[in-house]
Curated annotation (Swiss-Prot):
Pathway: Purine metabolism; IMP biosynthesis via de novo pathway; N(2)-formyl-N(1)-(5-phospho-D-ribosyl)glycinamide from N(1)-(5-phospho-D-ribosyl)glycinamide (formate route): step 1/1. PROSITE patterns: ATP_GRASP. InterPro entries: ATP-grasp, ATP-grasp_carboxylate-amine, ATP_grasp_subdomain_1, PreATP-grasp_dom_sf, PurT, PurT/PurK_preATP-grasp, PurT_C. Belongs to the PurK/PurT family. HAMAP family: PurT. This is Formate-dependent phosphoribosylglycinamide formyltransferase.
Length: 393
């Protein structure tokens, strides 16, 4: 029986976020609407979710002692990891001591590292995946590339948003892909996964929410990546009934194994009726930003309900919808966005500007959203809206 108290009072229901990016920001807003007291934690000040939380803390989240100190100080009812780069061993300890980690500390620990989740999916759950090897040294990596053949893909086992990821097409790429992977890992140099390339027709994110009443799937989200980073997404992605049924089977198997309650972003490769498991995030997914315009309950609202043990009787999808990111390149701590009237001039469009405090290189600073009569029209409209935004550094 869910009971929510009064924020900033002894009856408050407290939720603490480990990571305070744009996805967390939307979940915080949903929790604020339900009268939840929210604490946002990240490694830098004024992170997006901090701007809408009751209070915030800045710590190195890979420092287990610092993470424990904040959690023991705040005594949250729910701990919500929003990113992978967290001292997950500390979350496991805290969960054993009685804290609730969303969805589970094991899910956070397994998905922080591509090896944990790949071995779970392929070796324990026997789900279809690309052929793969792991390697710690250049020698082992070279042998894996030789074994899998070209083309193949290399990624650091610990990285996100495409960092350190390369597609190898010939022997000329072997050294530079290794060097790039060593630069791109979250915890510095280290282990990589080498995957055989799947010649897929398209890739999807199946947003899968585990809640008090069971497991519910959102309509499949199609997306386009560049260098492993999402550029645009759309919903619903057209699929054969067989491919959709197999996608739901795979997503249910992996999310059931990870357990707990919350939103999961299950990434899958599709070719005809065939489905391969790629990755899973035990939290809302960047490609799922499209649900801010495509569904009555966005992935963020669904995550909030699942966390609090509230029912999800139905998810209503509004038809062809798309998102296009607003990518900013350069250096600034005072970025401004202009020409917004033009960006929002067409019907059924929306913008989210994330409020990130700085840009240093390339950074996703917002997203344009659109609905239309077809996926093609929705994608074109979202791209027009995104392109219309003028960025001032």
């Amino acid at each position: 029986m869910t009971r929510i108290g009064t924020p900033l009072s002894p009856t408050a229901t407290r939720v603490l976020f480990c990571g305070s990016g744009e996805l967390g920001k939307e979940v915080v807003i949903e929790l604020q609407r339900l009268g939840v007291e929210v604490i946002a934690v990240d490694r830098y000040e004024n992170a997006p979710a901090m701007q809408v939380a009751h209070r915030s803390h800045v710590i190195n989240m890979l420092d287990g002692a610092a993470l424990r100190a904040v959690i023991e100080l705040e005594k949250p009812h729910f701990i919500v990891p929003e990113i992978e780069a967290i001292a997950t061993a500390t979350l496991v300890e805290l969960e054993a001591e009685g804290f609730t980690v969303i969805p589970t500390a094991r899910a956070a620990q397994l998905t922080m590292n591509r090896e944990g989740i790949r071995r779970l999916a392929a070796e324990e759950l026997k789900l279809p995946t690309s052929p793969y090897h792991f390697a710690d040294t250049f020698e082992a990596y070279s042998k894996a590339v030789e074994d899998l053949g070209f083309p193949c893909v290399v990624k650091p086992v610990m990285s996100s948003s495409g960092k350190g990821q390369s597609l190898l097409k010939s022997a000329d790429d072997v050294q530079k892909a290794w060097d790039y992977a060593q630069e791109g890992g979250r915890a510095g140099k280290g282990r990589v996964i080498i995957e055989g390339f799947i010649d897929f027709d398209y890739e999807i994110t199946l947003l899968t929410v585990r809640h008090i009443g069971g497991t519910t799937f959102c309509a499949p989200v199609g997306h386009r990546q560049e260098k492993g980073d999402y550029q645009e997404s759309w919903q619903p992605q057209a699929m054969s009934p067989a491919a959709l049924a197999e996608s739901e089977r795979v997503a249910k198997a992996v999310t059931e194994s990870l357990g707990g309650r919350g939103m999961f972003g299950v990434e899958l490769f599709i070719k005809g009726d065939q489905v391969w498991f790629s990755e899973v995030s035990p939290r809302p997914h960047d490609t799922g930003l499209v649900t801010l315009i495509s569904q009555d309950l966005s992935q963020f609202a669904l995550h909030a309900r699942a966390i609090l043990g509230l029912p999800i009787p139905l998810i209503r999808q509004f038809g062809p919808s798309a998102s296009a990111v607003i990518l900013v390149e350069g250096q600034s701590t005072q970025t401004a966005f202009a020409n917004l009237g033009a960006a929002l001039a067409e019907p059924d469009t929306a913008l989210r500007l994330f409020g990130k405090p700085e840009v240093n290189g390339q950074r996703r600073m917002g997203v344009a959203l659109a609905r239309d009569e077809s996926i093609e029209a929705a994608r074109a409209k979202a791209t027009r809206a995104s392109s219309a935004v003028v960025v001032e550094l």
